[in-house]
Amino acid sequence: MEYKIFYSWQSDLPHRSNRSFIREAIDEAVSSISKDGVVEDSPRVDEGMDGVAGTPEVATIMFQKIDSSAIFIGDVSLVGSTEPFDENRVKKRTPNPNVLLEMGYAAARIGWNRIICVMNERFGERQEQPFDVRNRRFPINYRLEPGKDPNRDTVKTRLAGDIKGAIEVMALSEHQRVATIRTKLDSRCLNLMNQFASQPSFPSPNTSTAGQVLASIPIDAAIMRLLDLGVIRADVNTQIGLYAYHWTYLGDLVLRGLAMRK
């Protein structure tokens, strides 16, 4: 089964030591695990597009890519610092704000347990990370000079191994979660899952008539349980007043485990 990895990069630091280097390590890690992994870079707006009307579409594409990803990998190398508002406070270091935005969205949509943080400590230590990053997802670290570094290949091999290990731990955790979820599915959930397993999403039940309201009761109960279990997620189109439920990556694993989806 194909799984997608969303790579959130930044360009504040040299590509050779960060963006392209981390991408090479991710590709190496994925290829050593499976041929089914697909790595997608975060879309970024070119400098000449800043402020134009089409800019929001990049954010839409970015969020959609994160929603469909199994794993989020972000470069949280420290790129800047805050200016204290009085002399009694010290400067605080910070990663790229776009990476933090994407990571926060990923945490809400696919969960902290599927987020991998990576940082080049040549530009700052892990202990300098913002509190949430430091305590929730302590970053995988490496140290590489921005110019020609004789240890580049050695550092990349070690980083690829660390990323591979993190992905494998996530895979084991997902397998255990799928097994646990399967024990919590009642007949209403199984009927709904079997009905819509072949579709990427399904609509909220129609309740225009009294009969439809009664018929929707077991469906609504199944939907609530599947939402609680993280098997589906809800999206709403406010323009047409339509609710739709989409299978999550975890939901896809559950469907495959039940032989409802190939």
Question: Model-derived features: where do they sit?
Answer:
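Conserved N-terminal substructure of TIR/SEFIR domains
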Residues: 1-71, 183-184, 189-197, 201, ...
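Short glycine-/polar-rich loops that comprise or flank the Walker A/P-loop
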Residues: 3, 69-70, 110-115, 133-137
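TIR-domain catalytic/interaction hotspot
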Residues: 48-103, 108
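Nucleic-acid nuclease catalytic cores
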Residues: 111-128
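C-terminal interaction surface of TIR/SEFIR-family domains
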Residues: 129-190
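Beta-hairpin "wing" of winged helix-turn-helix
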Residues: 234-237
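Short, amphipathic alpha-helical interaction segments positioned at domain boundaries
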Residues: 242-262
